[in-house]
UniProtKB/Swiss-Prot annotation:
EC assignment: 7.6.2.-
High-level lineage: Bacteria, Pseudomonadati, Pseudomonadota, Alphaproteobacteria, Hyphomicrobiales
Every ABC transporter domain range: 2-238
Name the UniProt record assigns to this protein: Hemin import ATP-binding protein HmuV
Record-linked NCBIfam families: PRK13548.1
Enzyme class: translocase
GO cellular component: plasma membrane
Entry keyword set: ATP-binding, Cell inner membrane, Cell membrane, Membrane, Nucleotide-binding, Translocase, Transport
Family classification: Belongs to the ABC transporter superfamily. Heme (hemin) importer (TC 3.A.1.14.5) family.
Membrane topology term: Peripheral membrane protein
Gene label: hmuV
Amino acid sequence: MIEARDLNVSIGGKRILSHVNFAAEPGIVTAIVGPNGSGKSTLIKTISGDLPYGGSITLNGQELARMKPAEAAMVRAVLPQSTTLSFPCTVREVVSLGIMRGYSAARDNCLPERALEKVDLAGFAGRFYQELSGGEQQRVQLARVLCQVWTPCLGQPRYLLLDEPVSSLDIKHQLIVLRIAREFAAAGGGVVAVLHDLNLTVAFAHHVVIMHQGRSVAGGTPEEVMQDALLSEVFDCQLKVGALPDGPTPFLLPQTAMV
């Protein structure tokens, strides 16, 4: 389990997170949602170990602040919002960085190709990363973090920490990525994902944490937290859960692809 208690984070003298309590259990997908500037990315960066914090964060019972980077890399893999490479690399070289940083089938020379196939990039290993589209690059980075924790449980649960993993993707690849997250959780690992699409959140998350103004204001199953009044207040616009739009306006739900 990943557990944060009374988490406080300041950046540049400004308080970003205030007294946040957070838990992500293995075996489920935990989604973090909320408006821009609510602290979602700061929260996932903090539980990843990328930001200094006040309070307590434990990873499978170990205090994160006391873990060496190599120890943390064995247990969790992090997909940031964006990654810039300033030197030319092939896709395979980028994905292979995950094997170097974490112990996961390290003797499997075909692991990068297997990870690329999983994210629908079979045949891309020899291409240059800089020549890919933004969405393709995002999936290459996901393949990298999958290599790092390829086995979801090695004596203890391992975790995928995903910051907006579908932000640059078309709907087909959004569904592929979130199915990967569900499969990882079903195999005993844990997933924490920052998401903006509330429909995708309802479709794939087991547990939802709602952030607002640097605080965790709600947590529970999608059915428990997706309530009209709460969402309207947090997102500062009138929202109705499950209400059809007026008139003949067409709309799509990702759930139709899951039948």
